[in-house]
């Protein structure tokens, strides 16, 4: 039996639309991510467990884990009879890389079960392909950090899909999921087809400056450059209370905040534990909309997807 855990991730990070993402893990030790188990069997089967299992498609072939198994078999050119179990701990349409968690855990578990016939680059390419079936287009800003860990910059040149960018140990990521769903496809459809020249220049300046600040170890500058002129001005209308929440967390002391992925999760970066706790308390009382919502104080997950049992 192989059991693989794949962590949540926060894509875009305001400054890097479709090209930046960070894997995150709660500081209290909770597992914020999906778990997939693979066991040898006579025929294929898939069982769904976990807090959000009831939100998965009722038709098994529509389940992305089934599609991962099917695509992996096609890649190897043979049917692999296994019993798969998906522990769905991540809310769907949350902006926390929920589909990436399932895809990464499923493909990594299949690869481990079969003795690692695929290298990490090929496996990551498959992960992007499968996740793209849900989001509507291939982009790696969730699957890359989820699989490899840390903060990842998408490269997609010279057979390199992504490379790690150094983060800051003092940063605490407060993630608040309000309990509503925002479809990635819907959130992409709301974006304009063309952008003004000054917005393109500002975006390039912010992203280049952010990467420079990370490598030159300037956390204050990096946080200051986490601005979004590409997606947030258009997507915030999908997120009730988002603008007020951003203003509130800034007043409390967050050094940066924005939409995690395509939302509705809000991320707030803090550089002190007491500030992070006050931000988390405010968001828990004011940004969550129902019982399915939650707030976690996290750090970068530098390990990425990992085998829990083998």
Curated annotation (Swiss-Prot):
Catalyzes the ATP-dependent phosphorylation of L-homoserine to L-homoserine phosphate. One of its GO terms (molecular function) is homoserine kinase activity. Keywords: Amino-acid biosynthesis, ATP-binding, Cytoplasm, Kinase, Nucleotide-binding, Threonine biosynthesis, Transferase. Pathway: Amino-acid biosynthesis; L-threonine biosynthesis; L-threonine from L-aspartate: step 4/5. This is Homoserine kinase. One of its GO terms (cellular component) is cytoplasm. It is found in: Cytoplasm. Belongs to the GHMP kinase family. Homoserine kinase subfamily. InterPro entries: GHMP_kinase_C_dom, GHMP_kinase_C_sf, GHMP_kinase_N_dom, GHMP_knse_ATP-bd_CS, Homoserine_kinase, Ribosomal_Su5_D2-typ_SF, Ribsml_uS5_D2-typ_fold_subgr. Pfam families: GHMP_kinases_C, GHMP_kinases_N.
């Amino acid at each position: 039996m192989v059991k693989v855990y794949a962590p949540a991730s926060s894509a875009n990070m305001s400054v890097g639309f479709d090209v930046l993402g960070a894997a995150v893990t709660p500081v209290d030790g909770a597992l914020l991510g999906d778990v997939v188990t693979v066991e040898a069997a006579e025929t294929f089967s898939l069982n769904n467990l976990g807090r959000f299992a009831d939100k998965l498609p009722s038709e098994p072939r529509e389940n992305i884990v089934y599609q991962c198994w099917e695509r992996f078999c096609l890649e190897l050119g043979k049917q692999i009879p296994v019993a798969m179990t998906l522990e769905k701990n991540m809310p769907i349409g949350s902006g926390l890389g929920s589909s990436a968690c399932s895809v990464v855990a499923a493909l990594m578990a299949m690869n481990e079960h079969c003795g690692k016939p695929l290298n990490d680059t090929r496996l990551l390419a498959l992960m992007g392909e499968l996740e793209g079936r849900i989001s509507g287009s291939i982009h790696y800003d969730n699957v890359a950090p989820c699989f490899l860990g840390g903060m990842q910059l998408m490269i997609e040149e010279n057979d390199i899909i992504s490379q790690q960018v150094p983060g800051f140990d003092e940063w605490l990521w407060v993630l608040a999921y309000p309990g509503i769903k925002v479809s990635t496809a819907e959130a992409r459809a709301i974006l304009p087809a063309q952008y003004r020249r000054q917005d393109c220049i500002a975006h390039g300046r912010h992203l280049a400056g952010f990467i420079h600040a990370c490598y030159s170890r300037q956390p204050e500058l990096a946080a200051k450059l986490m601005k979004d002129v590409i997606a947030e001005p258009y997507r915030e209308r999908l997120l009730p209370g988002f603008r007020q929440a951003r203003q509130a967390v800034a007043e409390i002391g967050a050094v940066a905040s924005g939409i995690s992925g395509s939302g509705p999760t809000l991320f707030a970066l803090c550089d002190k534990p007491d500030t992070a706790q006050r931000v988390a308390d405010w968001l828990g009382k004011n940004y969550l909309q129902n019982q399915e919502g939650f707030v976690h104080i996290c750090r970068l997950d530098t390990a990425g997807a990992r085998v829990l049992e083998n």
